[in-house]
Regions:
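Class I S-adenosyl-L-methionine
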Residues: 99-123
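Short, compact, well-ordered microdomains
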Residues: 79-97, 102-106
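Short acidic low-complexity segments
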Residues: 34-45
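Short, hydrophobic beta-strand segments that form beta-sheet elements in well-ordered domains
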Residues: 14-20, 35-37, 50
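Short acidic, S/G/P-rich loop/turn micro-motifs used as interaction or catalytic elements
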Residues: 23, 53-57
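Mid-chain, well-packed structural core segment of small domains
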Residues: 56-89
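N-terminal, charge-rich interaction modules
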Residues: 1-30
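Conserved beta-strand segments of the P-loop GTPase G domain that flank and frequently precede/overlap
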Residues: 18, 48-53, 77-79
Length: 123
């Protein structure tokens, strides 16, 4: 499977990316999405990708979550093995946004992505 397949990207989706610094990935998203934004999250996004390089960046997840479709997923993409940001902090940011974690994917050689969705009661 490609990274895009592991992340659940399908043609025709509404996709948003918030401060994600991966030009090739953003180009791929633009090519597959029905609607795409890399500035602010689109309402009813099927997928939202939030980039976080340090713990303070995790607040972006809470700001982006209200734009997520009820059956959508929010991915937090963060550096692997860095002191600036730990997995537990990423998990807590998703929880504070009202989401539950369901999956982890190796996004690239340097970054990991954690997937969050709305709890079943909110879908």
């Amino acid at each position: 499977k490609t990274v895009s397949e592991k992340l659940g990207i399908k043609p025709g989706m509404v996709i948003s990316a918030v401060v994600l610094r991966d030009a090739d990935f953003l180009t791929d998203l633009r090519g597959q999405a029905r609607s795409f934004s890399d500035s602010k999250p689109l309402k009813h996004s099927d997928l939202i990708f939030v980039g976080a390089e340090k713990a303070a960046d995790l607040a972006r997840a809470g700001k982006a979550a209200p734009s997520l479709h009820s059956a959508g997923a929010l991915w937090i993409v963060y550096p692997k093995g860095k002191r600036e940001i730990k997995e537990q902090q990423v998990l807590e940011a998703g929880k504070q946004a009202g989401l539950v974690d369901v999956k982890v994917v190796s996004f690239s050689a340097t970054h990991t992505a954690l997937k969050f969705v709305w709890p079943k009661a909110k879908r």
